A protein has these predicted regions:
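Charge-rich, well-structured scaffold segments of protease-associated domains
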Residues: 1-94, 110, 159-184
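Generic hydrophobic alpha-helical scaffold/packing signal
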Residues: 142-145, 154, 158, 183
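Alpha-helical structural motif
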Residues: 1, 16-20, 49, 79, ...
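Short acidic/glycine-rich loop or secondary-structure boundary segments that cap or lie
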Residues: 130-132, 152, 165, 176-177
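His/Glu-based metal-binding/catalytic segments typifying zinc-dependent metallopeptidases
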Residues: 95-151
Length: 184
């Protein structure tokens, strides 16, 4: 599996749009896990071994850190029995504390890379998941501006002005912070 992840990391590094998004997230949140590449780096992957994974499992996979949810036609008593059967032996452990919300870093950075196209990412503070009133408004705004082929960005920048083949907006909402961005 390590070699598969190594190949994925190399593929991302060779995909200008993915690289631009990773660099953008790192600029926005340089000192926070949200600013790190999801796959990690070749260096972080090389430093993971069985001992690290087992330690992580022991710390994180505890009863205090797990929520079991079920929806649909389910017998409550049967669900409780199954939950106890498969998860009852987990140690209680201590609930992990969430990291504080990262500060939004407003910066510009230009990176030169020999490619056929230019990649641009820009963004602003978005809406967090815990902001129930504004998260739905943000979803509608994002869909209107850049959420598909009929969006304003695609119609104006791609179709009318022929300035980019691909352009879209996105909203990444986390528990206590959000990021709204445009990428082309």
């Amino acid at each position: 599996e390590r070699s598969v992840i190594e190949e994925e990391i190399k593929m991302y590094a060779d995909a200008p749009d993915e690289l631009a998004n990773d660099l953008f997230n790192n600029l926005v949140w340089p000192d926070h896990p949200l600013g790190r590449p999801i796959l990690g780096t070749e260096e972080t992957l090389a430093n993971i071994d069985r001992k690290v994974l087992v330690g992580y499992m022991k710390e994180m996979y505890t009863a205090s850190n797990i929520v079991i949810a079920c929806a649909g036609k389910v017998e409550h008593e049967e669900l409780v029995k199954l939950t106890e059967k498969y998860f009852g032996s987990l140690p209680k452990g201590e609930r992990n504390q969430c990291l504080p919300a990262p500060e939004f870093n407003f910066v510009q950075k230009w990176v030169n890379k020999e490619t056929e196209q230019v990649q641009i990412c820009m963004g602003a503070k978005g809406v967090a998941n815990n902001d129930s009133d504004e998260q739905y408004q943000m979803s509608v705004l994002n869909a209107y501006l850049g959420g598909g082929m009929s969006s304003r960005l695609v119609q104006k920048v791609r179709e009318e002005m022929s300035m980019a083949y691909s352009i879209y907006s996105y909203h990444s909402a986390y528990s206590d912070v959000g990021l709204w961005g445009i990428a082309a």
